[in-house]
């Protein structure tokens, strides 16, 4: 077994026992990137010098008997949406090409303090707007299970890097499913924490009331360990929740016997791939065999979730992206004749088609005469969606559903059909509108060898419950041991 075949916690155990060094693991990760990334294209940039320096420092701490954390020395990748001091950060956009942040995002600082070498920045849909990684301004990433297909998005580079075993884990962000959907498409675990559980300070904003960073790993236990490092209140983020952080690993092995798990009937609809439905329904039966009770529940306003999301998220994006004008950082149009030209030409040249589409949608929703009819109404429906979940959680401990309606699709298949692309998040975005935690865990493969994910949704701040439920299923299977055919 190669070092890169180990999970985060397996590697951490070897580091603690002196059976491997962080420098060896980091060099193995860098070698794996060199070997397979020409096919996967998960990385936008690799910080070899920084990662190796951090690895050597980790080895020195372990040698002196003072590791910074249980994960000290475990190499990690970062979605290119997190500000990294001294390392270019683009959010997958031309408009930020060449931007080198002067400080770290809070989660990056926490990872560094915990001793994890950061190997590099991972590809993503531009400003996290997309479900296939094809809106990246630089190149699309490829799914390690079939390189002609998408790894999902917007955190597709993070998912692909973990699935290809280029890194032991990664961080992504989830605004409407951008951690969970690519996790489902790549046989990885993706956890979107409760809104406010993880700091957004230093995370380039898409939709501020929806964005949430989270872990992407090969196993549930790894996700719990990584969440433990990054989950905490942050005075620099006004939306950060001042809620106690539990030990996410404490009850991982507690099982599901006696739990009530809801199955929302609105999440099993026409348009779902038959093989996806079959895999998910088999997972539901597995939970019954493990001692859980399945309960049919209804989330009646789910049918309005997609329209609600695509009013609220673009409205927030149109405001957040107004700051990119060529004056302070990133791209500046060279052929401008006036300040007005600088603004207009920089945005014309710097933003891609999908970002422009969403800015226009959001500007329209907020415009005079349409604000009440569209944006305000969407916010009211958002409240109804949140109330649906509140009622459901009075009956059950968690909800189970597919993560994605289909397995990974061919690159180029949906790029000219925005609505079809938006439908990829139909099962994931209601959770963001309600601010709830959600997790995707591998639950099988199609006949063509494409991964399928099971989504688990929970009460606010019950990430520990989701991890426990996911682990009960994962314990019965070896999906995470399977290697992508690279």
Swiss-Prot record:
The active site is at 79 (charge relay system), 154 (charge relay system), 178 (acyl-ester intermediate). It catalyses: L-glutamyl-tRNA(Gln) + L-glutamine + ATP + H2O = L-glutaminyl-tRNA(Gln) + L-glutamate + ADP + phosphate + H(+). GO terms for cellular component: glutamyl-tRNA(Gln) amidotransferase complex. Its EC number is 6.3.5.7. InterPro entries: Amidase (IPR000120), Amidase_CS (IPR020556), Amidase_dom (IPR023631), AS_sf (IPR036928), GatA (IPR004412). It is an enzyme of class 6 (ligase). The keyword Protein biosynthesis applies. GO terms for molecular function: ATP binding; glutaminyl-tRNA synthase (glutamine-hydrolyzing) activity. One of its GO terms (biological process) is translation. Keywords: ATP-binding, Ligase, Nucleotide-binding, Protein biosynthesis. It holds the Pfam family Amidase. Belongs to the amidase family. GatA subfamily. Heterotrimer of A, B and C subunits. Allows the formation of correctly charged Gln-tRNA(Gln) through the transamidation of misacylated Glu-tRNA(Gln) in organisms which lack glutaminyl-tRNA synthetase. The reaction takes place in the presence of glutamine and ATP through an activated gamma-phospho-Glu-tRNA(Gln). This is Glutamyl-tRNA(Gln) amidotransferase subunit A. It comes from Myxococcus xanthus (strain DK1622).
